[in-house]
């Protein structure tokens, strides 16, 4: 039987982290001819992940430019993929999540009448500008996708409400849990020596990331003010803020927090360093989507610095709390976790609703099932009670 030709396409670090374990599984399957195309929407951060998981792309569009616009990214991805799809004629294209690469790649495949598989399908806030542009990227990708790999039952329900055919939806769990089984080590020694010097046993190390567009300006200012207050009022706290390289974020953070006692401003870490810092820290504050899924796997409470989330499962499970960017709310909720052992225990022991480390296997099986290689529909992910 002819192999199924699959091209996996991604362009940013979060996409690469979540697609890497799937690419490995595709490469191992004798029924699949697996190829990888990167757009390099975020060049440096993407390359770190490719090296970590030993992935050598077959195609590299290398579209990144300084001060790139969403329109520019979309146009360059569409143009670059047009020729690749014409030459390769894959059976299916796999895209991930909600980046501009995701939407543009799905659209390019649709124009060539190539099937689209959407990994991490069905996440919704139902507000097209929060997060921007991710909410519309994933909705539009869902509109052209043929196979929808929903990480949770909630994601599947969102797709059903949008009239997606149930037979094309597969609940797989999230591939990020698969990735973390590869990256987290018990006695990890950091490459960044500043992280090795932190006292994780006797200090409350708070890991922070905040960079989303909807938080630019006033949102980041408020987050910094809250962090300053927490650092000033608590000698047993060390804040590690992984500061995004974008000057819109970086300049505000450094103006507010640089040189403060108990605050460590570091550039974004590679995936392995990030996952192991998360594993050692006390709690996480973030506006990142990925960290909302990763931290529960490691039993870390998360304060989400956003007003809405497309990942309500962790909120329902009790491991994540939405606090937005209100200064008082951030400080109050942080203190609740820091000073109330029962609250900390409740959040850290919550069931992880996002995966069991087998999402990539389920996605490969779903593809084989769709193309008639497997007769039986694969089993779906369900969180352990």
From Swiss-Prot:
SUPFAM superfamilies: UDP-Glycosyltransferase/glycogen phosphorylase
Catalytic activity: UDP-N-acetyl-alpha-D-glucosamine = UDP-N-acetyl-alpha-D-mannosamine
Coiled-coil portions: none
EC number: 5.1.3.14
Gene Ontology biological process terms from the UniProt entry: lipopolysaccharide biosynthetic process
GO cellular component: cytoplasm
A Gene Ontology molecular function term of the record: UDP-N-acetylglucosamine 2-epimerase activity
Major place of residence: cytoplasm
UniProt keywords, alphabetically: Cytoplasm, Isomerase, Lipopolysaccharide biosynthesis
Record bears the keyword Isomerase: yes
Compartments where found: Cytoplasm
Family the UniProt entry places it in: Belongs to the UDP-N-acetylglucosamine 2-epimerase family.
PANTHER family referenced in this protein's UniProt entry, alphabetically: UDP-N-ACETYLGLUCOSAMINE 2-EPIMERASE (PTHR43174:SF2)
Protein name listed in UniProt: Putative UDP-N-acetylglucosamine 2-epimerase
Source organism of this protein record: Clostridium acetobutylicum (strain ATCC 824 / DSM 792 / JCM 1419 / IAM 19013 / LMG 5710 / NBRC 13948 / NRRL B-527 / VKM B-1787 / 2291 / W)
Upper taxonomic lineage: Bacteria, Bacillati, Bacillota, Clostridia, Eubacteriales
């Amino acid at each position: 039987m002819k192999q199924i030709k699959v091209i996996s396409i991604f362009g940013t670090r979060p996409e690469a982290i979540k697609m890497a374990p799937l690419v490995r599984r595709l490469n191992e399957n004798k029924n699949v001819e697996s190829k990888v195309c990167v757009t390099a929407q975020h060049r440096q951060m993407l390359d770190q992940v490719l090296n970590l998981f030993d992935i050598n792309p077959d195609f590299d569009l290398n579209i990144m430019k300084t001060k790139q616009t969403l329109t520019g990214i979309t146009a360059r991805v569409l143009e670059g993929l047009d020729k690749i799809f014409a030459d390769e004629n894959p059976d299916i294209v796999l895209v991930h999540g909600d980046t501009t690469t995701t939407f543009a790649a799905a659209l390019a495949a649709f124009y060539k009448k190539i099937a689209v598989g959407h990994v991490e399908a069905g996440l919704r806030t139902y507000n097209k500008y929060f997060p921007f542009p991710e909410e519309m990227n994933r909705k539009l990708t869902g509109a052209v996708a043929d196979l929808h790999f929903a990480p949770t039952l909630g994601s599947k329900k969102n797709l059903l409400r949008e009239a997606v055919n149930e037979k094309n939806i597969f609940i797989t769990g999230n591939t990020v849990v698969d990735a973390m089984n590869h990256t987290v080590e018990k006695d990890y020694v950091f490459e960044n020596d500043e992280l090795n010097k932190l006292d994780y046993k006797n200090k409350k190390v708070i890991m922070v990331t905040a960079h989303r567009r909807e938080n630019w300006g006033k949102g980041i200012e408020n987050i910094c003010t809250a962090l300053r207050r927490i650092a000033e009022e608590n000698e047993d706290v060390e804040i590690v803020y992984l500061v995004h390289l974008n000057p819109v974020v970086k300049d505000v953070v450094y103006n507010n927090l640089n040189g403060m006692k108990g605050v460590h401003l570091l550039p974004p870490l590679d995936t392995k360093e990030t996952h192991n810092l998360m594993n050692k820290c006390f709690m996480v504050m973030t506006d990142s989507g990925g960290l909302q899924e990763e931290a529960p796997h490691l039993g870390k409470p998360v304060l989400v610095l956003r007003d809405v989330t497309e990942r309500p499962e962790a909120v329902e499970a009790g491991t994540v709390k939405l606090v937005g960017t209100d200064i008082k709310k951030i400080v109050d909720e942080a203190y609740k976790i820091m000073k109330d052992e029962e609250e900390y225990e409740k959040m850290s022991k919550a069931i992880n609703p996002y995966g069991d480390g087998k999402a990539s296997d389920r996605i490969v099986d779903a593809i084989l099932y769709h193309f008639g290689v497997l007769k039986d529909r694969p089993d779906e992910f369900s969180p352990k009670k």
